[in-house]
Amino acid sequence: MDDMSPRLRAFLSEPIGEKDVAWVDGISRELAINLVTKGFNKAYVLLGQFLLMHKNEAEFQRWIICCCGATECEARQSSTCLKEWCSCFL
């Protein structure tokens, strides 16, 4: 975990609360806009989607790429971020 990005470290430092979706590591400004237009305005809403997919990273990555326009790198980073958050808080 020493190779954790500062953004991931910040996200994992506390409960999600009312954080905007842009707080999730791997979510660029452009992707955040796409997510907000699809109703995923808060990090907890995106986490809910991840949980609905039974924390299956590959399925979540396919979904965020196909439905929201994420790059493979964004998809990988965001799924890792949500998985790590679940490990810390659930």
Curated annotation (Swiss-Prot):
The keyword Nucleus applies. Disulfide bonds: none annotated. It holds the Pfam family SAM_BAF. It is found in: Nucleus; Cytoplasm. The keyword Nucleus applies. InterPro entries: BAF (IPR051387), BAF_prot (IPR004122), BAF_sf (IPR036617). GO terms for cellular component: cytoplasm; nucleus. Gene3D superfamilies: Barrier-to-autointegration factor, BAF (1.10.150.40). Keywords: Cytoplasm, Nucleus. Homodimer. Heterodimerizes with BANF1. PANTHER family: BARRIER TO AUTOINTEGRATION FACTOR 2, BARRIER-TO-AUTOINTEGRATION FACTOR-LIKE PROTEIN. SUPFAM superfamilies: Barrier-to-autointegration factor, BAF. GO terms for molecular function: DNA binding. This is Barrier-to-autointegration factor-like protein. The gene is Banf2. Its main location: nucleus. SMART domains: BAF. May play a role in BANF1 regulation and influence tissue-specific roles of BANF1.
